[in-house]
A protein has these predicted regions:
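Extended substrate/RNA-proximal surfaces in nucleic-acid metabolism proteins
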Residues: 1-106
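Charged catalytic cores and adjacent phosphate/nucleic-acid-binding surfaces used
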Residues: 32, 84-183
């Protein structure tokens, strides 16, 4: 994995530096050259094995990469897992998730709550609000909202619900960025 990370890291950083982005989300969609969307990643794995590998690889990437502002939709893997129960038992991986959060905080990076969980799974954002609370308890304060809208009708979908929940947790604001700097 390290060799792949180094090659991809160089390419990704070069790409990001070649455009005037205001904001960059780091997201894990592929592990070992396998995209979750097509289901190959899950073959021969229990739900626990797949989820553990996802969080472990996410931690490796968070430690290795610096070219993003926030980590996107931490529970992304549940969207495409072939398991009847689409939830993640975060307690089984909380040590890894805590290390992800602590690494992000130490690097001055944040997390995104993606509202697509309301749409796709009819539950909550990715990650769930218990994990957002945990991030806050660990002193994480950089937080954004994303929608994975992909169509104009879904732009902003469920953003107010998420923002209200942030306030209940204790966040003062939702972070925005200009030229890769937090506003």
């Amino acid at each position: 994995m390290e060799e792949i990370l180094n090659v991809n890291q160089e390419e990704i950083e070069k790409l990001i530096q070649s455009y005037p982005f205001d904001f960059v989300i780091g997201s894990i969609h592929v592990i070992h050259h396998t995209e979750f969307y097509y289901g190959e990643f899950f073959k021969g794995k229990t739900k626990e094995q797949a989820h553990r590998e996802f969080f472990e690889e996410t931690l490796k990437c968070v430690k290795a990469f610096d070219c993003f502002n926030v980590l996107g939709h931490l529970d992304y893997i549940v969207r495409y897992g072939p398991y009847e129960d689409k939830t993640v038992d975060h307690q089984k991986y909380q040590d890894i998730i805590d290390e992800i959060f602590k690494t992000l905080i130490q690097k001055g990076k944040g997390i995104e709550v993606n509202t697509s969980g309301y749409r796709d799974l009819k539950t909550c954002g990715f990650p769930n609000f218990e994990q957002v609370q945990r991030y806050y308890d660990l002193e994480g304060r950089i937080i954004t909202i994303g929608t994975d809208s992909h169509t104009s009708e879904r732009v902003g979908e469920n953003c107010l619900n998420v923002a209200k929940k942030y306030q209940e947790i204790g966040f003062d604001d939702v972070s925005t960025f200009t030229q890769r700097k937090r506003d």
